[in-house]
Structure formats: structure tokens, C-alpha cells
UniProtKB/Swiss-Prot annotation:
Gene3D superfamilies: Ankyrin repeat-containing domain, BRCT domain. GO terms for cellular component: centrosome; chromosome, telomeric region; cytoplasm; nuclear inclusion body; nucleoplasm; nucleosome; nucleus; site of double-strand break. ANK repeats lie at residues 806-836, 840-869, 874-903. It comes from Homo sapiens. GO terms for molecular function: protein-containing complex binding; ubiquitin protein ligase binding. The lineage of its organism: Eukaryota, Metazoa, Chordata, Craniata, Vertebrata. It comes from the Eukaryota. Keywords: ANK repeat, Cytoplasm, Cytoskeleton, DNA damage, DNA repair, Isopeptide bond, Nucleus, Repeat, Ubl conjugation. Plays a role in the DNA damage response (DDR) pathway by regulating postreplication repair of UV-damaged DNA and genomic stability maintenance. The SLF1-SLF2 complex acts to link RAD18 with the SMC5-SMC6 complex at replication-coupled interstrand cross-links (ICL) and DNA double-strand breaks (DSBs) sites on chromatin during DNA repair in response to stalled replication forks. Promotes the recruitment of SLF2 and the SMC5-SMC6 complex to DNA lesions. There is a cross-link at residue 931 (Glycyl lysine isopeptide (Lys-Gly) (interchain with G-Cter in SUMO2)). One of its GO terms (biological process) is DNA damage response. This is SMC5-SMC6 complex localization factor protein 1. Residues 12-77, 119-196 form the BRCT domain.
């Protein structure tokens, strides 16, 4: 950093934890101060993952700070110094096809430059603001944004004069306006974001002097207008007079008008001070002169006629007249030539105008064709989704969004039901409600009163009938029936006691079922309460699924219309995206739902508990419905959903599923009800597993072309993926550091011992190891024995669920430090989880094997039959850990308990556990423990073959999921090809549209590009299949065979209908 340059003070916003930690790692290489805080501090540079309206983003805008992309840190770290910020600033480049407006994209750059130019301390430096917002985290955040922009925030009670802005919640604005306590305009809370990101910058000094300048400019404009009006009137009169004079010259063949006009024009120069007067005078003079001229013309014509009759008698007169005739002819020819040129020019202009009209009409016609083709393609997608959701019906419903006109619930009946509920006559209350349900919508207060008693376990016997009422309500009066019904369900689906909104109830229900967490308020805690919570989640799933079905049907029914409008906000949109149709996919609720879904499947794979399986199914369904709704809205709005889904969701899910086996991943992917979700998660996993050895993976969104030309050849090479392994020098206690672990290790601090090198295994004294093991075992059985009963004081002091910054529990630390006594005590406690993982994914058994603590390993294996010997991080199992660090005795213990399957496990580099053993003798001893009647070489050869077979099978499954779902979503079926009059005809249409769009617009439509690529790939598919790798054709696996059959069927459709 140059001398005198202030030190960089960095904050970040919008990043996921993994990406943020990786950037922090890079910051350590640079001279800066990093502030890790959710609140805005007085930083110099804000690194933003995307454009947003977060506190830090708005505050940095208001303060005129540098708001930069993450590439600024990445490239600066690579250069070893801070680079110039200009090209990394948000707003440096404006993307035309972005979902953000150009105004919002350029806001950070505009505000920084504006504040620098004017020298103003902040965007709000002349504001005096009163905040009428409830005191909480939200109000504190608003104050920090205002203070960053140098606004003067004033307390409502001490409101002096001169207040410029009153910012309040929408609910309070109307009430406060009626009180009229503040002589200032009111603004909603979202005004701050709109002011900074959406509106043009208006200088406060300019706005103060605006009225003076406006008045002055109006006066000047009026003066100029009067002058211009006089000038235009004079110029028009001149043109008209000249035209009349030229016409008279043509008719009467006069020769003197041109010179008179020139003379007169020279005399009548325009003066700014007396234009009007001179104009009137000149016009009168010009008119009288023209009149005299006409008289003179008539007189001269008579003279000419007389001269021609007397030309034989008067030769001199004849010569004189001939001379005049020659002059007359010259002037006549000049005028005729001028008129001819003018007519030719007018005719040429009319031809150009007609051609321009024809070209415009052709362009409009081509645009219409493009729109028609795009609508046809969208209709195919909508139809495929409608089939998926069983929405195609014979009886269409053309009228939507009609307000529900049900009669008001009878007051007498309402009082009766309320009295029955208060008296705990729940059976009678539910019966009364059921009989009236077909004719009336039950009031929310009644359903809430019943729900409150259901949660308190007061209606145990009749809770089923209550949920039957909710199901009937959803069937008779769905949320999409009208905006009023949507509001009704948003009010209904919340905790009847806390009333914190729908998302709050969803979160509480999931946490109760998934983590056994307490409810948002005190309720009955019995075995059946979790079942009730699961039933409420089922109702929520049915509720949002009905909204997705309705939107799908509506898009299909109205696909021929250009004016499809969706009035009212769906529950899904309000809950997951705060009612914003333009919101990004991964909001906080969606992220939380993703994490819960993945965690629920991890729990499901550990047990056969029906409750856990049903919960995992429900969460996958809710997630799929939410994703589908966001995608359908994006298609309606023309958003490139393929790019957003591939970039955001797929990579996020694949990273979170690192510790899933291939079989678990298959079950996980197939559990999604959403075809889109299946497709993108399968692609993300495929890219990670099958393309990790390839350095260049295309960043283009998923397409048929990408699957056939990139993924299919990559799948054929899975048998040789073991080549080019990275070799890492081994140290005792130092695990091989894989890419996914490096950032965590850097931030958390390396937790392994650093010893010089790995000793040769031949030098190990195995007998000494065995004797020391026996001694330790004897000691652990005698002196170290301890239980919960005889050590109560220790148990009370020990919090075995507590973790340190690395995520290590008491079990991890006992195994790392070889604290056998503490380990035995911990293992005797109820509820202890021996398979618990730290932040990096390591278990206590991993740590004991890694550090060579043999007795700890033995105690775990003896006392915990549920210990997972196959648990892995990037493929590193406990056996990998033990043998890579030379702990052969531990390796023998693990093989005695785990068997030969442990020897078949590979890490991310493709290494087997025995690959770490240098000595053939030790290798044979370890192999003999498994009691396999085979040689180590043959065993490894079979393991290698089995491994590649599994890789090929799993890759085929992933590619099949992508291919089948893609063809289903975009309707690439034989019916589609037939309806398009064959691929050739459709390809010609798409190419024509594409070329037209490229000549008329910088950006082509993503849907046209996608289908054009799909059709081109389908046409070449028969030729491509002939060149498939041989291992794909001969592999006996079910998934590989299914993939080949799918491709062959697509080829038949192409050849048959083209």
C-alpha cells in the first residue's frame, strides 16, 4: 500500500458462511482491517455478494463508500496488494438482462461520485428525521442507515420545527397524519431503499434554489418564446410571399422579381430589439411592392404583344423584343429546372417513406412471429407442468380472482360455538361448525380458539375432526379463490397465542418435529404433541401445493393471452419472498428450509423411524412446491430461471450433501416432488463427482447440448478418473488437506500434531504396542472405571453438548488429548452421540485414530456398538486416518470390528487405506485379519473394478435424472416434434427468429436460444450415439442401461417424426 493511503477497513454483506470464510482467508494476505459484524460500521470498503437492500448496503451507499464485488479481494490477494477499485465497483457495468433496474445497479457508483463531487458528508445530510417505528432491531438498523448518511434523527417527543421527513410503518402513517403533530411529509420505511437505489440523485442545494431558478428560467423562456414566435411568423410570411412571387414570375414571365427580392432582403435585416415593428413595416412594404410589380408585369406584356405585331415594320423594336425574349427564356428554363428538381426530390422522399413503412411493417411482422413462437414454446412448458400437477381439465375456468361473496357467519351461531368452546364442549362445537361449513367461511377467531385447545392437548379425541374441517375449508375455499381468501389464510395459519405470522409458525413446527425444541409458548409436552405438529405441517403442505397447482393451471389456460395478471399475493410468495415477485431465490426462509430438508434426510438414513421418514418427505415436498412456484413466476416474467437455479440452488445443495453416500444421494434426489429441483441438484452433484478432475467446466446453464456434448463423454471417462492424483507429504497427525477443508482449517486453526515425519512401518515394535495396549486396558478396567452414579459432581460440571469455535465437543477433546477417564465417563452418559461431528466433519473416533490414542479407540469400539466406522470427510475414514499416520495397531482393531468393507473405501484422491502401508509384510498382516481367501493384489484389482462400476452407475443415475426431467420440463417429446412439423421446420423458424433478434437487439431471448440448441442437438443425436464410449454400452448396471434406453428412444422419435 502506498504511503499516505488510508488503511482498508472491510465489511461484507450477502455471502454464505463458506464463501465468506474463504474471502476472509484471502484478506489475511492483505493489509487491512476486517470487521465481522452484522451491523454497519464505519468501513471504507463494503464487499457485496449482490445488489440488495440490506443495512450495510444502504448505509454504505448513503455514506458514499466503495461497494465492490468479491473479485476485488480475489484479484488483490493474487497480486499481493490492493488494486484500483474502479473496475470492481457495483455500477461500473450495467447488465441489460439483469433482474435489477439500471438505476439500482448504478446506485453505489452514483452516490459515491455525487458525494465526492459536492463534498456533502452524506446522502441525508440536510434531513431532520422523526422515526415512528417500534423500538427493536429494525429501528436500530434504520437509525444506523440514516446516521451513515449524516441525517439528524430526532426523538418523536422532542420534535422541534424544521423536520423534513417523518418515517413510519404503513400501519401508523394514516393515524399520525390525522393527528397532524408533525408539519412534515410522511414516508414508509421502504422509502429509504427506494431513495438510495431507485431514484435519481437530486442535490439539496439545487433543490433549495429550485424555486428561484424556476421563476427566472420561466421569465427567460417567455422572452425567448415571444422572440421566437415573431421570428417564425416573419419567416413564414417571407416564404409565402417568395412562393407567390415565383408563381407570378412563372405565369407572367417577369424578369425583375428575383433582383427586387434580393435587394429588399438586404434592406430588411432583422434586429433583436425591434423585430415586431420592422416585421410589420417590411410586410406592408413587401405587399405594396408586389402589387406594383404585378401592374408593371401586365403593362409589359401588352407592350410585348404590340411589339410582335409590328416587328416587320419596326426592325429596331423587333431586335429589342428578341433580346428581351432570350432573357425571358433563360429565366423560364431556370425556374422550370428548379421546379423539376424540387418535384423529383419530393417524389424520392415519398418513395423512401413508402420503403421505410414497408420495412417497418416487415420488422413488426417478424417481431410478431418471434412473440408467437415464444408463446408456443412457453405453452409447451406450461402444458408439461400442468400435466405434472394434474391440472389439465376439460372444464376450464376462465374467470379468476372473483371475490368470495359468502354470507356473514350468523352472529347467534357464532356466540353459541364460542360458548361451547369456553365450556370445553369441543365435540358439539366442531359439529356445529361442520354443519355450516358448506355455506359459510368459519371465522378465524373460532378456528384459532379450537387450535389453541388442540395444542394444549385438550381435544385429543376430536383433533382429527378439527383437521377435517381445515381440509374441507381448503377444498371449498382455496387461497387463490380471491385476494381476500389469501389474506384469510395468512391470518389463520399462525400461532393463536403469539400471532407472529405464518413463517414463525412453520419454523416452530419444523423445529419441534426435527430438533425436539420447545414451542413458541408453553404447551402440553407429550408424545402425541409432535404428531399434531406434523399434521399441521401436512395441512401447510397441502395449502401451498394447491397454490402451485392453481398457478400452473392458470399459466396453461391463459398461455394464449398476453395480458395474464395475477391479482393478490399468494401465501407462498408472502412467506418465502415477502411478497416480492422479483426477489432472488435464496432468501432466509428458503435457506433455512433447505438446511432442514437436508438434515431431516440425514436423520432419516440413520433410523427406520416412521415419524422421521414422514417428516423428511413433508419437508422435501414443501421445498419442491416453493421452488416450483418461484420458477413458474419467473417463466411468466421472462426470467432466465435456468441460470438462476443452476448458479444458486444446485451448488448450495451439493455442498451441503458432502457426507451422503451415493445410495443416500439417489434416495435424496428422488424424494423431491419438483422436477426442476431433481434436475439441478443432480447436475450439481454430477459436476462435483464426475468432473472434479476436469479443470474447465462450462458455466453455461444446463441444456440438452451440454448434457450430450459435455456430460456424456465425461461419464464415459469415469473409469480412468484415478489418474493425476495429488500427492501430499504425510506427517503424523496431519490429515491430507482437501479443497473443501482448507478454509475451515485456516480459520479454525490446525488441530493436528506437527511431527517431523512418518516412521517406516518396518521399524515398529508391534509386540511392544501389544503389551502397552494390555496394560492400558487393565488400567481402564480397574482404576479408570467411572459411571454417572459414582461421579455425580463431575457430571453436573460437564456440559457434553457444548462446543468450541471449531465445533469440537467434550468427546472430541477427550479423544484428542487421550483423556481415557473422561472418555469413559462421557460414554456412560445417556443421550451421548459418539458419531457427533465438528465443523469440519470429524468424529471423536477420527480424532482418536488420527492422534494414535489406542485405548480411546478400544473403549469406543467396546462401549459403542452404534459407532460409524464408515463415516468420512472427503472419503477419509477412521481407518484412513490411522494408517496414514502409521498407527497399525489401531488399524487392526478397526478391521476386527468393521471387516473387509473398510478396505474398499476410497478418499477423494481415490486412495485405499492399504495404499498408505509401505511394508508388504504389514499389508499382509492387516489383510489377514479380514479372513479373505485372496491376495492383496487381486483384492485391490476387484475393489478398483467395483469402484469404477459404482462411479459409472451413480453418474448414469445423475445424468438420467437430468435428461428425463429436462425432456419432461421442456416437453421434448414425439408429440412436440410432430406438432412442430418436424425438427427441420422448427429449427428453421428458431434460427430465423434468433438471427432477427441478434440484428435488432444486443441480447437474444434465453428461451429461443435454449430451444434452438435443443433442436440442433436432437438432430445430431443419432450420429452422436454411434460414437459413445464402449464402457457405457457394455456396463451391466441398471442405471447405465436405463440411460442408454432413454437415449435410444429419443433417437427413434427424432428419426421417425423428422
Amino acid at each position: 500500500m502506498e504511503d499516505g493511503t488510508p488503511k482498508h477497513i472491510i465489511q461484507m454483506t450477502g455471502f454464505k458462511m463458506e464463501e465468506k470464510e474463504a474471502l476472509v482467508k484471502l484478506l489475511l494476505k492483505l493489509d487491512c482491517t476486517f470487521i465481522k459484524s452484522e451491523k454497519y460500521k464505519n468501513c471504507t470498503h463494503l464487499i457485496a455478494e449482490r445488489l440488495c437492500k440490506s443495512e450495510k448496503f444502504l448505509a454504505a451507499c448513503a455514506a458514499g463508500k466503495w461497494i465492490l464485488t468479491k473479485d476485488y479481494i480475489i484479484h488483490s490477494a493474487k497480486s499481493g496488494r490492493w488494486l484500483d477499485e474502479t473496475t470492481y465497483e457495483w455500477g461500473y457495468k450495467i447488465e441489460k438482462d439483469s433482474r435489477y433496474s439500471p438505476q439500482m445497479q448504478s446506485a453505489p457508483k452514483r452516490w459515491r461520485e455525487e458525494l465526492k463531487r459536492t463534498g456533502a458528508p452524506g446522502a441525508f445530510h440536510r434531513w431532520k428525521v422523526v422515526l415512528l417505528v417500534r423500538t427493536d432491531k429494525r429501528s436500530d438498523s434504520l437509525i444506523r442507515v440514516l446516521e451513515a448518511g449524516k441525517a439528524n434523527v430526532i426523538l418523536p417527543k422532542s420534535s422541534p420545527s424544521g423536520i423534513t421527513h417523518v418515517i413510519a410503518s404503513n400501519a401508523r402513517i394514516k393515524a399520525e397524519k390525522e393527528k397532524d403533530n408533525f408539519k412534515a411529509p410522511f414516508y414508509p420505511i421502504q422509502y429509504l431503499g427506494d431513495f438510495l437505489l431507485e431514484k435519481e440523485i437530486q442535490n439539496d442545494e439545487d433543490s433549495q434554489t429550485n424555486s428561484v431558478w424556476t421563476e427566472h428560467s420561466n421569465e427567460e423562456t417567455n422572452k425567448d418564446f415571444r422572440k421566437d414566435a415573431g421570428f417564425l411568423e416573419m419567416k413564414g410570411a417571407l416564404r409565402e410571399t417568395m412562393y407567390r412571387t415565383q408563381k407570378e414570375m412563372q405565369n407572367h414571365e417577369d424578369v425583375n422579381v428575383g433582383s427586387i427580392l434580393i435587394q429588399h432582403h438586404k434592406k430588411e435585416k432583422f434586429s433583436g430589439s425591434s423585430k415586431d415593428l420592422k416585421f410589420v413595416k417590411m410586410r406592408n412594404t413587401f405587399g405594396s411592392h408586389t402589387y406594383e410589380n404585378q401592374k408593371e408585369i401586365k403593362k409589359k406584356d401588352e407592350d410585348i404583344q404590340r411589339s410582335y405585331t409590328l416587328r416587320r415594320k419596326r426592325k429596331k423594336g423587333k431586335e429589342s423584343n428578341c433580346k428581351k425574349g432570350v432573357e425571358h427564356e433563360k429565366i423560364k428554363s431556370t425556374l422550370r429546372r428548379h421546379i423539376y428538381n424540387r418535384d423529383q426530390k419530393e417524389m424520392k422522399n415519398s418513395i423512401f417513406a413508402e420503403y421505410a413503412k414497408e420495412s417497418k411493417a416487415m420488422a413488426i411482422k417478424t417481431d410478431v412471429d418471434v412473440v408467437e413462437i415464444k408463446n408456443t414454446l412457453r405453452k409447451h412448458i406450461y402444458r408439461a407442468q400442468a400435466v405434472r400437477y394434474n391440472c389439465i381439465r376439460i372444464d376450464k375456468q376462465p374467470v379468476y380472482n372473483v371475490e368470495v361473496k359468502n354470507a356473514e357467519f350468523p352472529r347467534g351461531v357464532l356466540n353459541l360455538i364460542e360458548s361451547l368452546i369456553e365450556g370445553h364442549f369441543f365435540k358439539e362445537a366442531i359439529e356445529e361448525l361442520s354443519t355450516l361449513q358448506a355455506h359459510y367461511i368459519p371465522p378465524v377467531c373460532v378456528l384459532h380458539a379450537l387450535l389453541e385447545n388442540v395444542l394444549q392437548d385438550n381435544i385429543d379425541t376430536f383433533s382429527g375432526r378439527y383437521f377435517h374441517i381445515l381440509s374441507a375449508l381448503l377444498h371449498l375455499h382455496p387461497p387463490w379463490k380471491s385476494p381476500a381468501m389469501s389474506r384469510y389464510y395468512l391470518e389463520l395459519f399462525q400461532c393463536p397465542t403469539c400471532m407472529k405470522g405464518a413463517w414463525s409458525l412453520v419454523e416452530v413446527l419444523i423445529r419441534s418435529c426435527l430438533f425436539n425444541e420447545s414451542f413458541c409458548h408453553q404447551i402440553s409436552e407429550n408424545i402425541g404433541s409432535k404428531v399434531l405438529h406434523l399434521t399441521l405441517l401436512k395441512f401447510f403442505f397441502n395449502l401451498i401445493e394447491s397454490e402451485v397447482q392453481h398457478l400452473s393451471q392458470k399459466l396453461y389456460d391463459w398461455s394464449d393471452s398476453q395480458n395474464l395478471k395475477i391479482t393478490g399475493k399468494a401465501m407462498l410468495l408472502e412467506i418465502f419472498w415477502s411478497g416480492s415477485e422479483t426477489s432472488g431465490l435464496l432468501t432466509k426462509p428458503v435457506n433455512m428450509l433447505l438446511e432442514w430438508t437436508i438434515y431431516s434426510h440425514k436423520e432419516k438414513f440413520k433410523s427406520n423411524d416412521v415419524f422421521k421418514h414422514e417428516l423428511a418427505y413433508l419437508l422435501a415436498g414443501i421445498l419442491g412446491a416453493a421452488i416450483d412456484y418461484w420458477i413458474f413466476l419467473g417463466l411468466k416474467m421472462g426470467r432466465n430461471v435456468m441460470r438462476h437455479m443452476s448458479d444458486d440452488l444446485g451448488s448450495y445443495v451439493s455442498l451441503s450433501c458432502d457426507d451422503f453416500s451415493s445410495q443416500e444421494l439417489e434416495i435424496f434426489i428422488c424424494s423431491f416432488s419438483s422436477s426442476w429441483l431433481q434436475m439441478f441438484v443432480a447436475e450439481a452433484v454430477f459436476k462435483k463427482l464426475c468432473l472434479q478432475s476436469s479443470g474447465s467446466v462450462s458455466s453455461e446453464p444446463l441444456s440438452l447440448q451440454k448434457m450430450v456434448y459435455s456430460y456424456l463423454p465425461a461419464l464415459g471417462k469415469t473409469g480412468v478418473l484415478g489418474s493425476g492424483k495429488i500427492q501430499v507429504s504425510k506427517k503424523i497427525g496431519q490429515r491430507p488437506c482437501f479443497d473443501s477443508q482448507r478454509t475451515l482449517l485456516m480459520l479454525n486453526g490446525t488441530k493436528q500434531k506437527q511431527v517431523e515425519g512418518l516412521p517406516e512401518l518396518l521399524d515398529l515394535n508391534l509386540a511392544k504396542c501389544s503389551s502397552s495396549l494390555k496394560k492400558l486396558k487393565k488400567k481402564s478396567e480397574g482404576e479408570l472405571s467411572c459411571s454417572k452414579e459414582n461421579c455425580p459432581s463431575v457430571v453436573k460440571k460437564m456440559n457434553f453438548h457444548k462446543t468450541n469455535l471449531k465445533g469440537e465437543t467434550a468427546l472430541h477433546r477427550a479423544c484428542i488429548n487421550n483423556q481415557v477417564e473422561k472418555l469413559i465417563l462421557l460414554l456412560s452418559l445417556p443421550g451421548i452421540d459418539i458419531n457427533v461431528k465438528d465443523n469440519a466433519g470429524w468424529t471423536p473416533l477420527h480424532e482418536a485414530c488420527n492422534y494414535g490414542n489406542t485405548v480411546c479407540v478400544q473403549e469406543i469400539l467396546q462401549r459403542c456398538p452404534e459407532v460409524d466406522l464408515l463415516t468420512q470427510v472427503d472419503g477419509v475414514t477412521p481407518l484412513h486416518d490411522a494408517l496414514s499416520n502409521g498407527h497399525v495397531e489401531i488399524g487392526k482393531l478397526l478391521l476386527q470390528h468393521g471387516g473387509p468393507v473398510l478396505l474398499q473405501q476410497r478418499n477423494a484422491k481415490g486412495e485405499l487405506p492399504l495404499d498408505y502401508v509401505v511394508s508388504p509384510q504389514i499389508k499382509e498382516e492387516l489383510f489377514a485379519i479380514t479372513k479373505i481367501e485372496d491376495t492383496v493384489e487381486n483384492f485391490h484389482a476387484q475393489a478398483e473394478k467395483h469402484f469404477h462400476y459404482q462411479q459409472l452407475e451413480f453418474g448414469s443415475f445423475l445424468l438420467s435424472r437430468m435428461l428425463l426431467n429436462f425432456c419432461s420440463i421442456f416437453d421434448l417429446s414425439s408429440e412436440f416434434i410432430l406438432a412442430s412439423k418436424g425438427l427441420t421446420h422448427l429449427n428453421e423458424l428458431l434460427m430465423a427468429c434468433k438471427s432477427h433478434k441478434e440484428t435488432t437487439s444486443v441480447h437474444t431471448d434465453w428461451l429461443l436460444d435454449l430451444y434452438a440448441g435443443n433442436i440442433k442437438t436432437l438432430q445430431k443425436l443419432p450420429h452422436i450415439l454411434k460414437e459413445l464410449p464402449e464402457n457405457l454400452k457394455v456396463c451391466p448396471g441398471v442405471h447405465t442401461e436405463a440411460l442408454m434406453i432413454t437415449l435410444e428412444m429419443m433417437c427413434r422419435s427424432v428419426m421417425e417424426f423428422s
